Amino acid sequence: MKLVGTCPIHTDRLVLRRWSVDDAQQMYDNLASDTEATRFVTWPPHPNVDATRLLLTGWVRGYDDPDTFNWAVWLDEVIIGQIAVVDVDTRVNLAELGYCLGKRWWNHGYATETVKAVMSYLLDTAKVNKVEDRHDPANIASGRVMENAGMVIEGLRRACVMDSCGPRDSQYHGLLRSEWRGQQADD
């Protein structure tokens, strides 16, 4: 894996770039304070913009490390979401994604577009061997995003994630670099 860090990514409709502490109000308003948008992520909804500012301060500090991959997702000068590598296993060259999109932007293909763009960056530029993601089985829409982005279902891991309701199951999806190359050749 090449430690290339968080570089800007452009798609047809979106810009993915590093977070700034100045993004706190938009992040809070558009996703971090929304109980539905944060229902299946590992962090609780933020009670105020100060909590968002504190989180972003830590994320921005993390950019000093080239193994940090964490993007703000922009549509027409508005922050609509976040995507990051939440775990890396260097033994097998694997990167696990996590993402959150503001509810107003659901069902427009933005999440799939974001995941595809970051997978391309990780597989082609950072040279990971595998990108994976997981979702709560109750979050069917997130599973569809992963499948639409080209990932395949790998299995269910029971009671492996802790949230405010207790232990939860996770459905795993993944894509190998060799599979990615095959998909690109078919396009």
Predicted features along the sequence, with ranges:
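Hydrophobic residues in alpha-helical segments
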Residues: L31, V41, Y63-D64
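Acyl-donor (CoA/ACP) binding surface of acyl/acetyltransferases
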Residues: M1-Q26, N30-T35, N70-D187
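Conserved GNAT-fold acetyl-CoA-binding loop/helix
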Residues: E36-G58
